[in-house]
Amino acid sequence: MKFLTPLVLSSLASAAALNRRADMCGQWDTTTTDKFTLYNNLWGEGNADSGSQCTGLDSDDGNTIAWHTSWTWTGGAGQVKSFANVAYNFEATQLSQLSSIPSTWKWENTGSDIVADVAYDLFTSSSADGDEEYEIMIWLAALGGAGPISSTGSAIATPTVGGQSWSLYSGPNGQMTVFSFVASSTTEDFSADLNDFLKYLQEEQGMPSSQYLTHVQAGTEPFSGSNVKFTTSSYSVSVA
């Protein structure tokens, strides 16, 4: 969920195919490739009684990336500890000018007592380089009772987007309005046009089409669990 982190680049890469790299375990460690930035992002580790997390790049062929994160977090019930994620590198684009955001994602989780979500995290602003005003999350999994930000605790709508049923929640996160689409069942092999979710919000929930899409990320937010390994075997996205 949080993405405004100090940019400490662990390495740089060319557009050529990349193989596995050593895991990174620092709070703000990152790895960059031609199109993606992989974050360990332990933004909420202070909420935990104890724990750790490491994230690593497995491969990147220029269009599709594979990566993993291993974590254990205890304490701080109901509080997110981190957001290991991959961000797509692109120029901010006004929603009215978007044609498509095709994405595929194959992932799996192993471990004990997992409370976490697996989600896309998109941000928009009224200008290309302004502060974020909307956060759009697309939850492919709500594990162990994990729940989204919500003003009421109840879904505000149950739309069908991309051929799949979702419960839509809304609430504030600082200065941002957060919309969270939560899948009706865990989806470990996902394919959709993410622009369909943005179109729905513009048409049905009043999000202005003048907003700029500034960030597209995908990853997992742990609340608690032991010896968890989250593996993305294949992930792709583009913005057009």
Curated annotation (Swiss-Prot):
Assigned EC number: 3.2.1.151
GO molecular function terms attached to this record: cellulase activity; xyloglucan-specific endo-beta-1,4-glucanase activity
Matches recorded under InterPro entries: ConA-like_dom_sf (IPR013320), GH11/12 (IPR013319), GH12 (IPR002594)
Listed Gene3D superfamilies: 2.60.120.180
Origin superkingdom: Eukaryota
Localisation per UniProt entry: Secreted
Family label: Belongs to the glycosyl hydrolase 12 (cellulase H) family.
Protein name, UniProt field: Probable xyloglucan-specific endo-beta-1,4-glucanase A
Species classification: Eukaryota, Fungi, Dikarya, Ascomycota, Pezizomycotina
